[in-house]
Amino acid sequence: MDMQSRIRQLFQASIDTKQQAMDVLAPHIEQASQVMVNALLNEGKMLSCGNGGSAGDAQHFSSELLNRFERERPSLPAIALTTDSSTITSIANDYSYNEIFSKQIRALGQPGDVLLAISTSGNSANIIQAIQAAHDREMIVVALTGRDGGGMASLLLPEDVEIRVPANVTARIQEVHLLAIHCLCDLIDSQLFGSEE
């Protein structure tokens, strides 16, 4: 197969996955946006975490809220737990890599805050511990997962929201996660500041 054919094949696979996910995920993305808006209206904040590409997604979400998405508006409180290398490495060294997010959540999380927990497999041990810590702090969890939801899915409480991409290929799951994050940012902005024509 020549390279351009492979590129077209990858584009088509991404398009197909997004089309399959659209109707399945729309109600969950809507619900997650409402949970986040409710938290923000009640002086809560967003914490986010993930590993690898999902860490990048956590940072992307946080930056869109703190800075701006597609319009001028006030900054919104959001912290990506993936950015402080000194904190992450000290926790990993002194305790365990599995605690790099949970220890931060126990310090920073407050009742009514929201944790955006991202894992394509749903089985990342440090994300599972982050969810447990968020529940201990009376936070609501929005979980971005894929495949069968993994161990994360079984931890979620009725007030939590899972956005599970119906796919098994990591790259396709990540692509839908990014689109879901952009949808969340758009919906948060429109609910807080009104729709832009």
Curated annotation (Swiss-Prot):
Give all residue intervals belonging to the SIS domain: 36-197
What EC identifiers does the entry list?
Answer: 5.3.1.28
InterPro entries with a match to the protein in the record? GmhA/DiaA, Phosphoheptose_Isoase, SIS_dom, SIS_dom_sf, SIS_GmhA/DiaA_subfam
Tell me which GO cellular component terms the UniProt record holds: cytoplasm
One GO BP on record is: D-glycero-D-manno-heptose 7-phosphate biosynthetic process
Keywords in alphabetical order, please.
Carbohydrate metabolism, Cytoplasm, Isomerase, Metal-binding, Zinc
Cofactor(s) recorded in Swiss-Prot or TrEMBL = Zn(2+)
Listed Pfam families: SIS_2
Positions bound to substrate: 51-53, 64, 93-94, 119-121, 124, 174
The principal localisation class reads: cytoplasm
Which top EC class is named for this enzyme in its record?
isomerase
As its record notes, the protein acts as a catalyst of: 2 D-sedoheptulose 7-phosphate = D-glycero-alpha-D-manno-heptose 7-phosphate + D-glycero-beta-D-manno-heptose 7-phosphate
Which locations, inside or outside the cell, does it occupy? Cytoplasm
**Which pathway is this protein assigned to?**
Carbohydrate biosynthesis; D-glycero-D-manno-heptose 7-phosphate biosynthesis; D-glycero-alpha-D-manno-heptose 7-phosphate and D-glycero-beta-D-manno-heptose 7-phosphate from sedoheptulose 7-phosphate: step 1/1
Can you quote the record's cofactor note?
Binds 1 zinc ion per subunit.
GO molecular function terms listed in the Swiss-Prot or TrEMBL record: carbohydrate derivative binding; D-sedoheptulose 7-phosphate isomerase activity; zinc ion binding
Database matches in HAMAP family: GmhA
Q: What else is known?
A: The reaction produces a racemic mixture of D-glycero-alpha-D-manno-heptose 7-phosphate and D-glycero-beta-D-manno-heptose 7-phosphate.
Subunit structure of this entry? Homotetramer.
Q: Which family does it belong to?
A: Belongs to the SIS family. GmhA subfamily.
The record describes the protein's role as: Catalyzes the isomerization of sedoheptulose 7-phosphate in D-glycero-D-manno-heptose 7-phosphate.
Protein known as:
Phosphoheptose isomerase
Organism, by scientific name, is Pseudomonas fluorescens (strain SBW25)
